[in-house]
A protein has these predicted regions:
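PRPP-associated nucleotide enzymes
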Residues: 1-355
Length: 355
């Protein structure tokens, strides 16, 4: 069996040490000692307390709010430190890829920051990237190094079968057209029906019905405003059930990311209005901003389930049973083992394959 390094060295920063410890435990190894802190100047300091020369290094870091930028910087510095310490191969394991929603130029002068992050990882010295449930699979094309995009689908299937009463008569729902492929894949695996919700932005519809006008000359005060950000008060979203009959059904919403919870709230409301008996929301990455946490108990769902790609310990405790997590440590550990041994990663996600 081919091995690219003498042994697996698993490092982690401050983003999600609990997940790294769980992955290390499943691999039967100890985390490589690494101290990540800040100088008084707030610059990031990284000290690796064990040799990584000629080793197969995996750095697990999942940048998450409120310290996304600090976590990303930690990851880049750790990669660079291992590179200059003569590691044989460096794999960045990033369960929740940062800036993934900035993946296209959707307005004038908008940066494609997901591409910038890809460039930074490669320049820092990463030879390989492992991530999970990318917001857009095309992000893999931003890299000139190998990228493995893992899927939480098997873990979600297991949760549905074990925790959702009457799941065989449930229906899988995508809250928008963009997530239809993800939701239909899960529905096919479970042999369940599929429903799709259509989302419309009222301001966009109004704008499409008017002729373009010459914009006014900007004033000094306008230069200092958040001109590039949408004014939420000016955008009214409307959702309507486009495909599928949910009356009397247990509905399982599937999406890749929850931040403000706005999409989940609107979609669950539509399903309730159309006669759904219960609504579960299964989301790959729970960013869960402070605003979301304040309103989480009012979400019209029975359960909000997210993976532990981001540490949810405090949020779970604060939600009184509404929020649950799915453990992705097994699939990450197995992907690391297979990468180290030169085995197929795609085999992990074939039907009847186990890990």
């Amino acid at each position: 069996m081919h091995q690219t390094g003498n042994s697996i060295k698993l490092l982690t920063g401050n983003a999600h040490p609990k997940l790294a410890e769980a992955v290390a435990s499943r691999l039967g190894i100890a985390l490589t000692p690494c101290h990540v802190s800040k100088f008084l100047s707030l610059e990031t300091s990284v000290q690796i307390h064990s040799s990584v020369r000629d080793e197969d290094v995996f750095i697990l870091q999942s940048p998450s709010p409120p310290d996304v930028n600090d976590h990303l910087m930690e990851l880049l510095i750790m990669i660079s430190a291992c590179k200059t310490a003569s590691a044989k191969r460096i794999t960045a394991v990033i369960p929740c890829y940062p800036y993934a929603r900035q993946d296209k130029k959707d307005k004038s002068r908008a940066p494609i920051t997901a591409k910038l992050v890809a460039n930074l990882l490669a320049v820092a010295g990463a030879d390989h990237v492992i991530t999970m449930d990318l917001h857009a699979s095309q992000i893999q094309g931003f890299f000139d190094i190998p990228v493995d995009n893992l899927f939480s689908e098997p873990s979600m299937m297991q949760y549905i079968k074990q925790e959702v009463d009457g799941w065989r008569d449930a229906i899988i729902v995508s809250p928008d057209a963009g997530g239809a492929k993800r939701a239909t894949a899960l529905a096919d695996q479970l042999n369940l029906d599929f429903a799709l919700i259509n989302r419309k932005r009222r301001r966009d519809m109004a704008a499409s019905m008017t002729l373009p006008t010459v914009p006014p000359t900007p004033t000094g005060s306008e230069y200092g405003s958040d001109h590039g950000h949408d004014d939420e008060s000016a955008i009214v979203e409307k959702m309507e059930l486009l495909v599928g009959d949910v009356r009397g059904k247990v509905c399982i919403l599937i999406d890749d990311m929850v931040d403000t919870g706005h999409t989940v709230r609107l979609a669950a409301g539509v399903l309730r209005d159309n006669g759904a008996s219960e609504v579960y929301a299964l989301i790959s990455h729970g960013l869960l901003s402070d605003t979301t946490m304040d309103n989480l108990r009012d979400l019209p769902v029975k359960k909000l389930i997210v993976t532990n790609s981001i540490d949810q310990t405090e949020r779970v405790q604060a939600c009184g049973g509404l929020l649950e997590t799915i453990d992705i440590a097994p699939v990450i550990a197995e992907s690391i083992r297979r990468t180290h041994n030169g085995e197929s990663i795609s085999a992990l996600f074939r039907p009847h394959e186990g890990w």
